[in-house]
Amino acid sequence: MYEPLSLKLHSTHYERFVIKGKFLYKNNLKFYIKGVTYGTFAPQIDGQQFPLEAVVEKDFAMMSANGINTVRTYTVPPIYLFDMAEKFNLSLMVGLPWEQHITFLDDTSRQEAIISRVSEAAISCNQHPAILCFAVGNEIPAPMVRWYGAKKIEAFLKKLYDAVKEVDNEALVTYVNYPTTEYLKLSFFDFDCFNVYLESQAKLSAYISRLHNLYGNRPLVLAEIGLDSMRNGEDRQAEVLKWQIETVFGKGCAGMFVFAWTDEWWRGGFEIEDWDFGLVTRDRQPKLALPVVSNSLNKLPVNESHLPFFSVIVCTYNGAATIRDCMEGLKRLQYPLFEVIVINDGSTDQVADIVKEYPVRLINTKNNGLSSARNTGMNNAKGSILAYIDDDAYPEEHWLHYLAYAYIHSRHGAMGGPNIIPPEDGLLAQSVADAPGGPVHVLLTDEIAEHIPGCNFSVKKDVLMKVGGFDPLYRSAGDDVDACWRIQEAGYTIGYHPSALVWHHRRNSLKAYWKQQKGYGKAEALLELKWPERYNGLGHLAWAGCIYGGGGNVTVQTKKDKIFYGTWGSAAFQSVYQPGSNFIFSIPFMPEWYLFMAMLLVPSVAGIFVPTLQWAWVAFASALGIFVFQAILSANSSAKKSAWQQQTFTYKFILTMLYIVQPVARLTGRLKHGLTPWRKRGAGLQLSNFYCFNSRVFTHWSEEWLSAETWLEMIEQNLISLRTRVLRGGAFDRWDIQVRSGWFTRARGLLVIEEHGANKQFLKFRCNHKHSRYGFITIILLSIITFVAGLYNIWAIGVFTLFLGMLLVAKYIMDSISVSNSLKKGFLMLGYKNDTSSELKMVSKGIHLLPLEKPIQTTLPDWFDKHELQIDHKSTTSN
């Protein structure tokens, strides 16, 4: 049993630690955990596993003098240690130990006893002001987790969390995990803690990025880092601790604990004498690492001598309602080298008057749209790095520090970070934040992004100017996507720092949300028109990376997650691998699902007058039910991941309705601006190019030698200029380039080059078709239904399915002609030589090879003069 602390503490009011985004706060001030571990120590006569009070006082005084502000204990400390911590302004992470090293879930009574002891231990601390948080476990052995399975362990840890919250609801509660069980899903804890021992700076940096992405917009604390000085020497220990601390804070962690304060360590009934992890020796003599650690802790979060100059650019149009929050947030930035430029894009409200109250540069322009305003900011910026933030967002105080750290330690051309809804926003705004269609980032790796949203978008000025700035075509949305693609096409990478965050207000009304989603639908249409090769037949973008952020769609999973344990559970880093979602189950989330339901509604309504069509009501109800079920499933999943604490019926109902409404708004914007499933892309129709089941070979003679890669890149760029969706062949594909125009068919090209000496080349380009199985199956099914309906004289159904089948056959033929013509023209355009002075020309989209009108003069024999060579390929179809 635990003895309770002095009851007088209950009557003393004090501020508790709270979580805000990625960090801890106390008294509205950010609190970086700069900690050391303390213990465990050999038991005293009274059973306490801590040194005598005089020793603790000396230790805590030395800690405080060296910039340490937090102490982690592995057992509940005695009263004097709490009071001593308060005296020296130290906070405590209190471990609540229990027998996690045995099969503790076998016996229900043992589980209840553990929960009871953890609860009593928390009560015994009596809400002492020195408490930072409670840790209800530390590294449950991986074999135990594997023995019971992750879900049972997670469920038991949730019970321990609830037990502490019942006796101290305002206390922060965590669990200390480690890489071998990183797959545990513990989002119910207040923040995440990991013990990580890596002796390579690059590996530590990469693993911290991984942990940030695994656990999202929550504080991450490394609960143990360090190095043994007995085996590595004091010099090496000091060197490693220096870069460990700088990396931990530079990568955006909320804090860390050095293991340990002293070499004195007692475990398992024995004094451990063959490990020396301490900053001081057993007799409390400082090691070389102590002043190094102290110096590193005084330069947080970024310890860099040469920081870049930032130009923070805010573009606003009638943003008076939120611009003050933005200006106040920028005013609180702790970064030493930056300017703020506000572009007033023809606002008609009071935004200019508000901005004039702050020491920033205000530039007033006509209402030319968001992209134009961003370019105005770029052209007037003094900084080498441009940091764009929306007028309805405001930055975390070290936003620029983290961006600077990321730029200094990488070669990225651009950099982004998360955008989080402010905790003070209300129910509706939080529902919108958790709904689909919000500003999210897409990551290719833990540190490299494919897309970063414009509300938190930074880029090197020379990089942005090199790619031509933002495209004025996008007046309100889509500009960030287009810019990201052009930056990557120019050969640069886009980085992501998980703690370079901004607080972003979401739409606070359903009308505003509807308007926003319609605008995003319009932006999708404009992007598809400019980048058709990135979209599929239905007009949807297939990201190469993984989408992070709220509002994700959850499909029915046919496969379970797989955990990599290693042989016999021996892997040091054990991760969970999630199977990709099934395409079939993702179809109901597409806006076009509403078109499908509308198509079913037509015969359903007709069934009121034609009894044979009443079956359509079943199909329509099924389609609607599938969509509503998926919306409820996704809304519940999003709610579980949300930071919103009030998980009420109203919140979940609004969230579900937003999941239902969002595709309609998106579809409205897409259809209105031409992004339809029946749109035409590519070189158009030419009946002479209609070949479906045989191959064709096209040829080209060149007097100038080029590599196969260069020829293929030229063909690819020609196809892009024809607004064709292009895909490169992969490492296992026996084709080089694929084009697709619609739903049912795609054409593939394979290049071979004959070398004829004197730099002369003869190119052969074989093209054939790859047909959609789904298209054939659909047409066959409709044909069968039509035949059966005619056989039984059910003419209404027969006519309907016949008409639908004829439409699909016509669509199939047009798609086949289009892709055939596109691939042919893309190759034959090689007959136009590029002027060397304009071989690479920058346009708003990126870098393109532009064909000139003058054809290449060749010396081919007459029988080679034809561009096209027809060959019988009965047995040479492409794989």
Model-derived features: positions:
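Active-site mouth of glycoside hydrolases
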Residues: F23-F189
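Extracellular glycoside hydrolase catalytic/binding regions
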Residues: R146, K151-G250, V280
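Aromatic-rich peripheral "rim/lid" segments of glycoside hydrolase catalytic domains that contact
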Residues: F259-L307
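Short, acidic, metal-binding catalytic loop of nucleotide-sugar glycosyltransferases
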Residues: E328-L337
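A conserved acidic beta->alpha catalytic loop
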Residues: G329, N344-A352, A393
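Short aromatic/hydrophobic "clamp" motif used to bind/position activated sugar donors
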Residues: L386
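Conserved donor NDP-sugar-binding/catalytic core segment of glycosyltransferases
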Residues: H398-A429, T493, S499, H505
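A recurrent flexible, glycine/aromatic-enriched loop bordering the glycosyltransferase active site
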Residues: I421-P422, P439-D462, K466, R475-S476, ...
